[in-house]
Design a protein with these regions (language model features):
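Extracytoplasmic
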Residues: 66, 98-100, 127
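Structural recognition of the beta-strand scaffold that forms the well-ordered cores
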Residues: 71-73, 104-105, 132, 141
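Thiol-based oxidoreductase modules, predominantly thioredoxin-like and allied folds used
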Residues: 73-76, 100-115
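Local sequence-structure signature of Cys/Sec-based thiol-disulfide redox active-site neighborhoods
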Residues: 62-95
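N-terminal targeting signals for export/organelle localization
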Residues: 1-57
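Sequence context surrounding c-type heme c attachment/ligation sites in exported
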Residues: 90, 94, 98-104, 121-122, ...
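Non-catalytic, surface beta->alpha helical segment in thiol-disulfide oxidoreductase systems
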Residues: 126, 131-151
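Structural alpha/beta surface segment adjacent to cysteine/selenocysteine redox centers
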Residues: 114-127, 133
């Protein structure tokens, strides 16, 4: 499971391909914040990031318990839920001073596949899917959107 974090690091980062359905670019495969801050993705990323109001009490709880956490985040730049939730996730991660080297961001195509198959065996059927690991063991998931709050 967690071996996906490190085995795929030699692949192309922030690979953009043409999406026939939307007639624009979409990211596929391993990505990072820098990819989301490039056009055309920066339009929705920056808007949602800036507009999200943090729950400061919840952020403090997360900050106190995030030391041994790592995250796999599957998303689609073509997906409305991903466009809404992923910038908010980054806002929370920034607020808790999360080390982004412990975040693996994988962009999927419309069929929920990535070029290197990082999703294989992880039961990814919807995006975004955020998987939390503590000491290399999965401890939770948020799929599409949270029930109450991302924090």
């Amino acid at each position: 499971m967690v071996s996906h974090f490190f085995t795929s690091c030699s692949t192309t980062m922030n690979q953009a391909v043409y999406d026939k359905q939307s007639k624009t670019k979409m990211l596929v495969g391993l990505s990072n914040r820098g990819g989301l801050q490039q056009d055309p993705f920066s339009v929705w990323f920056n808007k949602e990031y800036g507009a999200y109001a943090l729950n400061k009490e919840a952020v403090q709880v997360i900050k106190n318990d995030s030391e041994n956490l790592s995250i796999m985040l599957f998303m689609g730049t073509w997906c409305g839920d991903s466009r809404r939730e992923v910038p908010r996730i980054y806002r929370i991660l920034d607020a808790v001073d999360f080390d982004e080297s412990r975040l693996t961001l994988i962009n999927m195509d419309r069929e929920k596949n990535s070029p290197n198959g990082e999703e294989t065996g992880l039961n990814i059927h919807h995006v975004p899917t955020l998987i939390l690991y503590k000491n290399s063991s999965e401890i939770g998931r948020v799929i599409e959107s949270p029930i109450q709050s991302l924090e």
